[in-house]
Amino acid sequence: MNEKRRKIVKFISAELSSICARLGDVEDEEQECVDNTPENLQDTERYTHAEECVEILSDARAEIETVIENLEGV
């Protein structure tokens, strides 16, 4: 791979890192919401959806981190 394409890949990797950090911020905020939900509301659909969102965000971040690691080998 030539230098120009390597720079593009490095730029994309940096952008993915930024996206991953932003997703982490959203995940942390949603987790805080889940953690602070009163016990009497923990059996609601909204609470369950919030828990699912935290898991989805966590999984997405893990996938992005894997992509970033793979790009480091380029």
Task: Specify the residue positions occupied by each region the protein language model found.
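Long, low-complexity or tandemly repetitive, helically biased scaffold regions used
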Residues: M1-V74
